[in-house]
From Swiss-Prot:
Expressed by the skin glands. This is Ranatuerin-2OK. It comes from Nidirana okinavana. GO terms for biological process: defense response to Gram-negative bacterium; defense response to Gram-positive bacterium; innate immune response; killing of cells of another organism. The lineage of its organism: Eukaryota, Metazoa, Chordata, Craniata, Vertebrata. The keyword rRNA processing does not apply.
């Protein structure tokens, strides 16, 4: 359903955002 698709997309965006944040905090190359 559309809701499931939206939930999946939100999870992916959140995961990508967290990865970038960890990257900046640790000072490693992304």
């Amino acid at each position: 359903s559309f809701l499931n698709f939206f939930k999946g997309a939100a999870k992916n965006l959140l995961a990508a955002g967290l990865d970038k944040l960890k990257c900046k905090i640790s000072g490693t190359q992304c």
